[in-house]
C-alpha cells in the first residue's frame, strides 16, 4: 500500500494518548508527503476506550461521510495498540477496504491478525475481518510505551510455549496435524524474543525488536493457517473464562488479555510438568476405555460446571472433540504408539513453570494469581472450564482420556506446587 501513489485520502484514527505519542507525527508526515489527510478521528483518553461495536460504527460512519465529501475511498490508519487496531479493523471491513496500522506498544499479537475481538451487547466475540495491509513500528516509541503494556505483550507471546505443546499433542492424536511452515513462523524466534525480560522492563529499544517481531509473526501465522491454533492453546481459555467473569475489568486501564494469559500459561506449564512425570507409554488402555464416561455423563458434568448460555456453548464445543469408547481406544493407541517421539518434542518445547514465572516477574508481567486479583483456588476452579470451553484438543483432554486429569490438577496445587 502506498497512499501517496494511490492518490487516496487518509484518516488517522487514534485516542488522545496515541495521538500525542505518534498520531500527530503520522498525520504531519502524510501531509508533507502530499497526501490528503482528513481531519483525524481522535477518541478521548478517558474513560478508557472500549472495543465495542458502537465505537467501530463511529469510525465506519466517519469513513462513509468522508468518502462522500472527497469522492474517494478514504484509507483508515490506526495509530495505537489493541483497541484502536481492532476497532479500525472492523470499521475497514464494514466499508470494504484495507487499512494500515502504526503500533505504539508491543502489547498483543493481534496487529497482523484477521480477527477483531469486539464487545457486542456485553459479549465478546471475534469478528472475522481483513488483516492490515501495512504494519509499522517505531521501536523507540514502542520502548517508551507504558510498561504494563509491554508486560501484556510478553505474556501473550509467552503463551506460545504451552500453546505449541498443545498442538504437538493434537498432532500426535491425529486431530490437527502440525503445519511446519506455520509452526516455524511462531516458534522459531519465541525463546529469543522472551530472553531479555530485564531489558524489556528497562525500555531498551534493542530488546523490543524480538518481542515486536514475535508478536507480528504470530499474527501472520494465524492468517496463513486461517485459525488461532498456531498461537494459542488451553492457556488462552483460562483468560477467556476470566474475561467472561470480568476479572480486572474495574481497573484503569482494565486488566489486559496478556496479563491474564500469563497466569494461564503458568497454570498449563505446571500441568505439563505433572503430566510428563508419568509415562504414557505404559498406560493401561483397557482400563482407560472401561472408565470412559458416556456423552450423557459428560454433558451433565459440563452443565454442572457452567451456567446458562455458557453451558450450552461448552456442550456444543466439547461434543466436537468427544469420542465414544471405540474412538477413545483408537486415539489412545495412536498416541501411545508415538509417545517416545511426542514426549521428546514436548520436552524440547516446554519450560519449567518456576523458571518461567521468574521471567514473567522480571518482565513486569503477572506471575502469581494475586497479581490479577485471583487466588490459587480460583485458578484451580478454572481448569475444568478451560477443558470444556472450546473444541480445540489440548493436553487437558488427553489427560482426561487417560484417566489422569483430576489427579494431575490435584498435584499442581499440592503443598509443593507453584503457588502453594
Describe each region flagged by the PLM.
Residues 39, 48-73, 106, 225-228, ...:
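Non-transmembrane, aqueous-exposed alpha-helical and coiled segments at domain scale
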Residues 15-21, 80-86, 107:
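Gly/Ser/Thr-rich loops at beta-strand to alpha-helix junctions
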Residues 90-192:
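A glycine/threonine-rich phosphate-anchoring loop and its flanking beta-alpha core
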Residues 66-91, 95-104:
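A short, small-residue-rich loop immediately preceding and capping a beta-strand
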Residues 4-75:
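ATP/NTP phosphate-donor binding region
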Residues 278-420:
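C-terminal charged capping/lid subdomain of soluble metabolic enzymes
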Residues 187-201, 205-277:
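A conserved active-site cap/scaffold subdomain adjacent to cofactor or substrate pockets
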Residues 5, 65-71, 92, 125-130, ...:
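Solvent-exposed alpha-helices and their adjacent loops that cap or buttress functional pockets
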